Each structure stands twice: as C-alpha cells, then as structure tokens.
UniProtKB/Swiss-Prot annotation:
NCBIfam families from the UniProt entry: folB, folB_dom
GO biological process, one term: folic acid biosynthetic process
Annotated Gene Ontology cellular component terms: cytoplasm
Keyword list, A-Z: Folate biosynthesis, Lyase
Enzyme Commission designation: 4.1.2.25
Family membership noted in the UniProt record: Belongs to the DHNA family.
General function of this protein: Catalyzes the conversion of 7,8-dihydroneopterin to 6-hydroxymethyl-7,8-dihydropterin.
Protein name: Dihydroneopterin aldolase
Residues the record marks as active site: K99
Reactions mediated catalytically: 7,8-dihydroneopterin = 6-hydroxymethyl-7,8-dihydropterin + glycolaldehyde
Record-listed substrate binding positions: E21, Y53, I72, E73
UniProt xrefs under Gene3D superfamilies: 3.30.1130.10
A GO molecular-function descriptor: dihydroneopterin aldolase activity
Length: 119
C-alpha cells in the first residue's frame, strides 16, 4: 500500500494525566503514516488525486493545540477519527505521539504511544 508520511510534527498542547501537563502544557511530537492509494496521483500530477498533507497537518494541529485529553492514547484515537472523517481516501492510519519532557523522573529521549487503525 502507498503511504503519505508526516514525521516529527511539533505542537504545543495541554494533554496529560498530571496537573502540570494540563496547566503548563508541553511539546508533542506526532508521526503519521497514512495508507492511501497514490496510483492516480503518481500518473496525473494532480493534487486532487491525493490527500493534501498540508491539510492533514492543519487538522492534527487543531486537535493537539485546541483539544485537551488526559491520555495521549485518546488524543491519538481522536486524530484517527478526525482524519478518517475528513479524508475519505485514507484507508489506514498509524499515529505515534511522543512527549520529550513529561513530568517523570528519569533519563530518556521521549515517552509515547503508537496506534494503528483501519477503516
């Protein structure tokens, strides 16, 4: 299956189980892998034959920066639901969300989750 990929999209949001996360906010890194049939676009060179990744980015930004979820698992689920609703050609989605600086002690690059959903 063909794919459209958006990597390390950076957004500022107020999601998390800790009070500090909900009030101070933090950076969220979002990776998306969208399964889309790109056959027509690969032949036509027409934007109408694909999913516009700029519009995908804006849709995800609205959710991450405008919404508020306790769990990033729920945020990822909401991203999948919204993208399926807005972009009918998307057949499957893999979304990963990472926090680089959650309020937990320890040494790590990031913590996060990954979901895969199909229509």
């Amino acid at each position: 299956m063909d794919k459209i990929v958006l990597e390390s999209c950076r957004f500022y949001g107020y999601h998390g189980a800790f009070k500090e996360e909900q009030t101070l906010g933090q950076i969220f890194l979002v990776d998306l892998e969208l399964s889309v049939d790109l056959q027509a676009a690969s032949l036509s060179d027409q934007l109408t034959d694909t999913v516009h990744y700029g519009m995908v980015f804006d849709s995800v930004r609205q959710l991450v920066e405008g919404g508020k979820f306790i769990l990033i698992e729920r945020l990822a689920g909401a991203i999948c639901e919204q993208l399926f609703n807005e972009f009918p050609p998307i057949e499957a989605i893999k979304v990963a969300i990472k926090k680089e600086n959650p309020p937990i002690a320890g040494h790590y690059k990031a913590v996060g989750i990954e979901l895969e959903r199909q229509r």
